[in-house]
Amino acid sequence: EALDLGITRKRLRSGDLTTPFRGVRMLGPIADSALAYRPLLRHGDRFSSITAAGILGAPMPRWAESQLHVTAGAGLTAARMRGVVGHASDGHGFVEVRGLPISHPGQVFLELATLLGVEDLVAIGDHLVLEPRVAEPGRPYLSLDELARVCAAVGRRSIRRARAAQALVRVGAASRRETLMRLRLVDAGLPEPQLDYPVYAMDGTFIGWFDCAYPDARVLV
């Protein structure tokens, strides 16, 4: 059914989706936990950090699945509850994704810079700026320019790490594995590949999409 709706096989294999039953793909436990906690949110509260990234469908490390991050609304104290990592109000607003209030995607990137390494952050950034082949409402979550402007802010914890990761974010990587492959290729001294590259036969027949390509060298990955 998903394929009939235009969802690609690559998207169905993405790491942010789980398989509770054969033939069923759904968002992982982070989004489920947020939905369960939603009735407890106070006016102005928002999901932030790892939880917000999970709601956005970003590829998260396994250890993050058990943490629910909630940032308090203006004038409210940080949430205190077992299983919840409460954060004091920081004056930032929220956006709604899947009916849940979360930090703005650019803010999520900065929040994660205090917890994740550069490679993990790049994978998050690639997800945020991705333009899916099949249009999805609200995607991309932000542009490369918007992410650069967010990271140009000063005086924030781990801003150097955020900027280092932001400089490596590219449009076209649809999974964490694709991000890591690109980074490994560049680390090995190869030039940056073109991402999500369409290939056509000599007669113009479409052959398929490839994760990485070096067209001048006639190399596809």
Residue ranges and their predicted role:
Residues 43, 132-221:
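Surface segments flanking catalytic/ligand-binding clefts of nucleic-acid enzymes
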Residues 1-160:
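Short gly/ser-rich loop at a beta-strand->alpha-helix junction or flexible surface loop bordering the NTP-binding
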